[in-house]
Amino acid sequence: MSDENKQPHPMSQRFRGFLPVVVDVETAGFNPERDALLEIAAVMLTMDEDGWLRRGETHVQQIDPFEGANLEQSALDFTGIDPWNPEREAVPEREGLSEIFSPIRKAVKEHDCKRAVLVGHNATFDHNFVFAAALRADIKRNPFHPFSTFDTATLAGLAYGHTVLAQACKLAGIPFSNKEAHSAAYDAEKTADLFCGIVNRWRELGGFPPPPIEIAEEPQE
């Protein structure tokens, strides 16, 4: 098939030309400019020819704390991450983010999208850490939209009446292990399953494509 006759990927028609990519970060605190980024996972999403959203491959990087980074002990206790454990095989922020961003840029092109949009559970947290790290690492080609995100905490509150990831997953019929939680890969994959489930359920219910709606005219005074 020639490029002229090639049909655009269905994903490019679903989210205004954006490719949703699910991201979870594990950190040494809550301040993206001061506290260390320790782990990042990105889960790719795709859409089949029938328009159903599916989870794809997962990319994970362990990250070395940047020079001068703050490490809150309470955050380390919560995640169970030892930043100095050599078995982590951690890499500097620039190398780790480059390894995460590269397949995302490739997927954006393959899905005929114009850029990626970050999906996360409480997405602002992940978005802020990704962008702060990219700025420190002087990475110019950040594939993510600079401010738009899809937040599964908000979507789950609408769909299931619960904003906690573990509880929302259980209500959605997605198995969730508290023992495996707080690993970037595990949390990102569960968030991806939750996001796909909500988007697909909305489609099943007839919410997308949106039905024609007659726009009422403003009353004339």
Swiss-Prot record:
The record marks F30, F78, F125, F147 as: Important for substrate binding and specificity. This is Ribonuclease T. Its EC number is 3.1.13.-. Disulfide bonds: none annotated. SUPFAM superfamilies: Ribonuclease H-like. SMART domains: EXOIII (SM00479). NCBIfam families: RNaseT. Mg(2+) 1 binds at D24. It comes from Marinobacter nauticus (strain ATCC 700491 / DSM 11845 / VT8) (Marinobacter aquaeolei). The lineage of its organism: Bacteria, Pseudomonadati, Pseudomonadota, Gammaproteobacteria, Pseudomonadales. Trims short 3' overhangs of a variety of RNA species, leaving a one or two nucleotide 3' overhang. Responsible for the end-turnover of tRNA: specifically removes the terminal AMP residue from uncharged tRNA (tRNA-C-C-A). Also appears to be involved in tRNA biosynthesis. PANTHER family: DNA POLYMERASE III SUBUNIT EPSILON (PTHR30231), RIBONUCLEASE T (PTHR30231:SF2). GO terms for molecular function: 3'-5' exonuclease activity; magnesium ion binding; nucleic acid binding; RNA exonuclease activity, producing 5'-phosphomonoesters. Keywords: Exonuclease, Hydrolase, Magnesium, Metal-binding, Nuclease, tRNA processing.
